[in-house]
Curated annotation (Swiss-Prot):
HAMAP family: Nudix_RppH. The lineage of its organism: Bacteria, Pseudomonadati, Pseudomonadota, Betaproteobacteria, Burkholderiales. Its cofactor is a divalent metal cation. Residues 6-149 form the Nudix hydrolase domain. This is RNA pyrophosphohydrolase. InterPro entries: Nudix_hydrolase, NUDIX_hydrolase-like_dom_sf, NUDIX_hydrolase_CS, NUDIX_hydrolase_dom, RppH. Belongs to the Nudix hydrolase family. RppH subfamily. Keywords: Hydrolase. It comes from Burkholderia cenocepacia (strain ATCC BAA-245 / DSM 16553 / LMG 16656 / NCTC 13227 / J2315 / CF5610).
């Protein structure tokens, strides 16, 4: 579904935890990471599309999140011709997105990447809000920057945990020493939510190269 100018309506989701860290999903069978996002179907409102995409890509339901804010208007980006399928060239220009900022009120183990039979991600992690954008594909960087900047006004100080700290926080980027394995939260068809070790070679770049397209 395209508008008169050739832009496809879309929603993007910035999901926060209590520490104001953001959810990043690893693209299925790729080394690319991104925020949850997807197209708005005919007849859907942006909010309806957001909740649908949230469940399809993270397994979360409306009761697991709280809407903190959204962008005031559409944020647009044009897609270079080399990334557009030949059959839609001349009609499709890019995407226009409404971005939602959500606060997760459920638990980490409520996240399930196999909520549908067409998963988008095969791993996920929390990262700092101001993730570097130099790894985002160039024509989409401005949209990420605009969304993060506009929605940052809704941020509050991270919630204070009542329980005793369990040790030092994980560093912003995983340390890679030779073939040493790193710990990454992964969800597959047989595990609802678990931590397993993966080879450091699968984490080529942190912050990850981000691909925003569906």
């Amino acid at each position: 579904m395209l508008d008169r100018e050739g832009f496809r309506p879309n929603v993007g989701i910035i999901l926060l935890n209590a520490r104001n860290e953001v959810f990043w999903g690893k693209r299925l069978r790729e080394h690319s990471w991104q925020f949850p996002q997807g197209g708005i179907k005919y007849g859907e409102t942006p909010m309806q599309a957001m909740y649908r995409e949230l469940h399809e890509e993270t397994g979360l339901h409306p009761e697991h999140v709280k809407i903190i804010g959204r962008t005031r208007d559409w944020l647009r980006y044009e897609v270079p011709d080399k990334f557009i399928k030949r059959e839609v060239r001349g009609h499709y220009r890019g995407q226009k997105q409404i971005w939602f900022l959500l606060r997760m009120v459920g638990r980490d183990c409520d996240i399930c990447l196999r909520a549908t039979d067409h998963p988008e991600f095969d791993a996920w992690r929390w990262n700092e809000y101001w993730v570097p954008l130099d790894a985002v594909i160039e024509f989409k960087r401005d949209v990420y920057q605009l969304a993060l900047t506009e929605l940052s006004r809704f941020l509050r100080r991270p919630a204070q945990r009542a329980e005793k700290p369990r040790g030092p926080r994980v560093s912003r980027y995983p340390r890679v020493i030779g073939a040493q394995a790193q710990t990454l939260t992964i969800v597959d068809a047989s595990v609802v939510c678990s931590e397993i070790e993966v080879e450091a070679s699968t984490l080529d770049e942190m912050p990850p190269r981000v691909i925003v397209g569906k």
